[in-house]
């Protein structure tokens, strides 16, 4: 009764091929040749490169992109301009007169002017006409006395008139200049120096200053020159504010 009630299953399109044979044939049909893969990849790359070239050409033709390409980033030297110290620091402090400081270094009034040496506030930044003859080393090292490392030449600072409105203050430079044949200058700070005339140093170590090598002097000069003009102006103004009350005593 159960066999009669169940309908007979009839499979159409039957085959005698086994599953192994069927899947083997399917794998053979689907597997492409390696040469075809390489050729298709090269074709795709060529198409992509052609599209990229067209896109790049369209981008270059845009006005905004053309303007940006003209403003390419400059090299470090081009952005900084001249690599020397004078170009980075600009003009020296104040207006230097003719032949103010002749030497290899940048002509600037160094730190630590002698007490009572130059007066007149900002007007003291104009040096005398004869100028100083140095070899590029720093004039003043930071104290209140003139302490040149290489020494000034004879008749270093010449001129009868003084810079600025106050002229030359106490202990100032005479006609013979610093350490010259005239009265010279009285260095009141630590380690002043004595010239051929009556100029003398009243501080400690006036004539016993150690001799430094050229490399050490150049290193000191480079360290000083690396400071900006604003920093030097601030130091000079602070020092002149300290020395003005003392000179007016």
Swiss-Prot record:
Region described as Interaction with PRMT1: spans on this chain: 154-207
Cross-link Glycyl lysine isopeptide (Lys-Gly) (interchain with G-Cter in SUMO2) residue location(s): 70
Modified residues (N-acetylalanine): 2
Location(s) in or outside the cell: Nucleus; Nucleus, Nucleolus; Nucleus, Nucleoplasm; Nucleus speckle
Post-translational modification: Asymmetrically methylated by PRMT1. Symmetrically methylated by PRMT5.
Biased composition (Gly residues): 158-196
GO molecular function terms noted in the UniProt entry: methyl-CpG binding; RNA binding
Positions of modified residues (Phosphoserine): 40, 49, 64
Superkingdom of the source species: Eukaryota
UniProt keyword annotations, A-Z: Acetylation, Isopeptide bond, Methylation, Nucleus, Phosphoprotein, RNA-binding, Transcription, Transcription regulation, Ubl conjugation
Function: Plays an important role in the ligand-dependent activation of estrogen receptor target genes. May play a role in the silencing of fetal globin genes. Recruits the 5FMC complex to ZNF148, leading to desumoylation of ZNF148 and subsequent transactivation of ZNF148 target genes. Required for the tumorigenicity of glioblastoma cells. Binds to 5-hydroxymethylcytosine (5hmC) and associates with the methylosome complex containing PRMT1, PRMT5, MEP50 and ERH. The CHTOP-methylosome complex associated with 5hmC methylates H4R3 and transactivates genes involved in glioblastomagenesis.
Quaternary data: Interacts with PRMT1 and PRMT5. Interacts with the 5FMC complex; the interaction is methylation-dependent. Interacts with FYTTD1, SET and PRC1 complex members CBX4, RNF2 and PHC2; the interactions are methylation-independent. Interacts with ZNF148. Interacts with WDR77 and ERH.
Official protein name in the record: Chromatin target of PRMT1 protein
Source organism of this protein record: Mus musculus (Mouse)
């Amino acid at each position: 009764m159960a066999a009669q009630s169940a309908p007979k299953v009839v499979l159409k399109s039957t085959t005698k091929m086994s599953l192994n044979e069927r899947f083997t044939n399917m794998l053979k049909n689907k597997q492409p040749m390696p040469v075809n893969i390489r050729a298709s990849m090269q074709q795709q790359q060529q198409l992509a490169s052609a599209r990229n070239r067209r896109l790049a050409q369209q981008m270059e033709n845009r006005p905004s992109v053309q303007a940006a390409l003209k403003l390419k980033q400059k090299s470090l030297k081009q952005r900084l301009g001249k690599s020397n110290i004078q170009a980075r620091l600009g003009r020296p402090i104040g207006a230097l007169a003719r032949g103010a400081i002749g030497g290899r270094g940048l002509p600037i009034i160094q730190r630590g002017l002698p007490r009572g040496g130059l007066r007149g506030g900002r007007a003291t930044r104009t040096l005398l006409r004869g100028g100083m003859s140095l070899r590029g080393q720093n004039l003043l090292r930071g104290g209140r006395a003139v302490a040149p490392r290489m020494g000034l030449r004879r008749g270093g600072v010449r001129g009868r008139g003084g810079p600025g409105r106050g002229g030359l203050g106490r202990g100032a430079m005479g006609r013979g200049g610093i350490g010259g044949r005239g009265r010279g200058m009285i260095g009141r700070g630590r380690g002043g120096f004595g010239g051929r005339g009556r100029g003398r140093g009243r501080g400690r170590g006036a004539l016993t200053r150690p001799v430094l090598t050229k490399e050490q002097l150049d290193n000191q000069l480079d360290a000083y020159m690396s400071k900006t003009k604003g920093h030097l102006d601030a130091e000079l103004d602070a020092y002149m504010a300290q020395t003005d009350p003392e000179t007016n005593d």
